[in-house]
């Protein structure tokens, strides 16, 4: 149960490609995966394939970096190091987990690169505020309601049949500034309706 790497890579690839323009030269994908070679990652492969299609003849450098062996402090240091190397600052930074997204958000603010580096993040807690302010271009959100429903369904099948034989792909949504503003309006409307 969850989001498959292929599904996640395809979805991220679509969004990364939508941010590629004639000025895009470098894309960096940050993952925390138990993979020796980033080229073996389905996520990296799908993003790379989508970007190459969108780029056409433009030569875009796509790199992946594995931050698996790092803790919170080390992740923060690794992300900061990316921005300290002025020649290697990516035009698009893809973050595949909440911690890396938060570190990237902070680094973009610290180095005064908000709006210059497009961050495609993961998770929606305080990141929604950064999306609203334009610091993070878009963030990925797993449909937790659907995840819960599938969990109950799988457990029910297991209790009834003694097994479950399906892999449940959970939907993912990408939230940009317009989507976040819509969510806020709906939440405000729901809140006002419950008070009345």
Question: Where do the model's predicted regions map?
Answer:
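Hydrophobic alpha-helical
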Residues: 51, 67-129
């Amino acid at each position: 149960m969850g989001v498959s790497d292929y599904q996640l890579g395809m979805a991220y690839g679509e969004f990364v490609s939508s941010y590629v323009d004639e000025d895009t030269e470098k894309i960096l994908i940050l993952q925390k995966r138990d993979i020796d070679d980033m080229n073996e990652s389905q996520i990296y492969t799908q993003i790379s394939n989508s970007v190459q299609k969108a780029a056409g003849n433009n030569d875009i450098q796509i790199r992946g970096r594995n931050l698996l062996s790092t803790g919170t402090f080390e992740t923060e240091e690794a992300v900061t190091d990316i921005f300290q190397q002025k020649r290697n600052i990516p035009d698009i930074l893809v973050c595949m987990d909440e911690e890396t997204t938060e570190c990237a958000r902070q680094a973009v603010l610290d180095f005064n690169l908000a709006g210059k580096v497009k961050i495609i993040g993961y998770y929606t807690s305080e990141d929604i505020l950064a999306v609203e302010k334009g610091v993070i271009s878009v963030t990925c959100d797993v449909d937790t309601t659907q995840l819960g429903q599938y969990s109950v369904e799988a457990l029910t099948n297991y209790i009834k049949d003694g097994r479950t034989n399906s892999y449940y792909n959970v939907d993912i949504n990408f939230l940009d500034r317009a989507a976040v503003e819509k969510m806020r309006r709906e939440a405000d409307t729901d809140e006002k309706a419950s008070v009345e």
